[in-house]
């Protein structure tokens, strides 16, 4: 678009002789059950969830609610709706990822949310949800990401195979100007920023992860990842680990400090799309839409992956986020609900 096996501990000396750690499948065990189901208004016939996320500055979970046209903010502690903001006109048809709003990001007092109806990005005042500006896009949006260090908004547009980058001049009404367009032949899919290295990472649709310089907006590297279909990305910048979700049912760990070297892979449920990681607990959350499950992995200091638990989710449940405090949220598009899981 943002997710079984077991490993024993590996010493540093042993690692020196290994190019790649591959986890073995874990023996079948009963799937664990989510602790709560959160219903989203208008979701009785399903919601085309996609890029759900967490806004640390607001302390809320971001739920762009697809064809309802609403951005829903959840209080992760209570599981209750903290705010609902209208982004675009509700769609009449059944749920789909490219209807209404499907991605949102926070930055510098603003919320930016995708609008598939225009297509464009709607800019809200984060204090009250008031619409401040609308930005027209060249093509339909996928990911909407704010790069705070440069006050830029990056919008991926897979159909046009490009990323549009906008400069944001803050004020009562922000001034938004197109900075550049980055061509991405064969992509882009997913997007994460590495501010330590002034990089952005995105995937191509087949076996490649692309490195972009966030200062020049130029691609500076192309890494071979072990995925037939690379999808979601997550980054632990402090350790230099880039996690890549493979739609065929695998997750990989790349070393961003050594040319994208593959450190480890592990099998997981098929249909992987969006993934999420918690650097504090060193846990990686990997849902599979086809397997209707989510695996929680422990990430070792070497990058090896150890499966801690597998939860039952739902068919089509492809997106996940967490609040960094052990609360994990998985979308259930068919039911129009959010599944809450307590990290073990």
Predicted regions, residues:
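Bacterial N-terminal signal peptides
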Residues: 9-22
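N-terminal secretory signal peptides that target proteins for export/translocation
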Residues: 1-5
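Predominantly soluble domains enriched in secretory-pathway, periplasmic, or organellar proteins
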Residues: 20-344
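Short amphipathic alpha-helical "recognition" segments used for binding
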Residues: 7-10, 161
